[in-house]
Amino acid sequence: MDLNKSHISRIIHANNITLKMTRIRHEPVKRFGKDIDINNNLKEFYDEIKKYKIEDIICIDETSVKSLQKRNHCYSEKGKRCVIKTQSQEVFKKYTGIFAISIDGVVGWDLYEKSGINADRMVEFLETHITNKFRNKLIILDNASSHRNPKVKELITKYNHLLYAVPYQHFTNSIENYFSMLKSRLQKLDGLTHSELKRNITNTIKQIPKEKYRNIIKGAYERPEKYVSKKNKTRKIKKNYL
């Protein structure tokens, strides 16, 4: 039997098989030499989340921010490459940003010109934006070493509650989705220096609607127990080609 590519494509399409972006999810069975069960860890994580109102959740994390924020794809005339020419050495710089979000928006942020987040900077950030302002909130952090420092734990748990995201499961800290939204908007703005980037971040935060924060946190922490597939109007009745 001789099948051409077009016919194979029709068979695949008629059987509701579509090309999707590949997602790699790391689910190891050991961590630091000890057995771990990712699924059990996820269950315990969400069981703990259910004890709190969504209004009482604050997610904190740091992210690397490039000085040159530009889209990976852009429009250009046929036959011509899309090239952005730069002269300043500022384009090679990266900065470390730390943010805290709730359903009400960004409750605190900072952008460090040099070095990353260590325990001392984490404590300073918490004292400035979180622990002196909030009580009985659930603070969600990832498993970075600076987040697990005893001083950080003690400061948070004095008046609030602390929950660590599940290792290797970045979606358990909803702020990761916020970073994607923030950076996609920064790509549309000009500015290379540290001060220009801080100005752009300030303006971008003001422009992000409040409901976006609620959607991000609800999407991460009010997940259904079991995924229910929505009715798809484009789904076809499978054909038997044999």
Model-predicted regions and their roles:
Residues 149-159:
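Short, aromatic/basic amphipathic alpha-helical patches
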Residues 25-33, 107-120, 135-138:
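Surface-exposed cleft-lining segments at the edges of enzyme active sites
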Residues 1-30, 56, 63-67:
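Conserved short alpha-helical interface segments
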Residues 39-128, 228-237:
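Extended, low-complexity cationic-aromatic segments
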Residues 83-89, 157-174:
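RNase H-like polynucleotidyl transferase catalytic core
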Residues 5-7, 11, 54-55, 175-242:
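C-terminal anion-handling pockets and recognition modules
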Residues 61, 135-148, 173:
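Acidic/histidine-rich, metal-coordinating catalytic segments
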Residues 141-143, 164-187:
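RNase H-like two-metal-ion nuclease catalytic core shared by retroviral integrases
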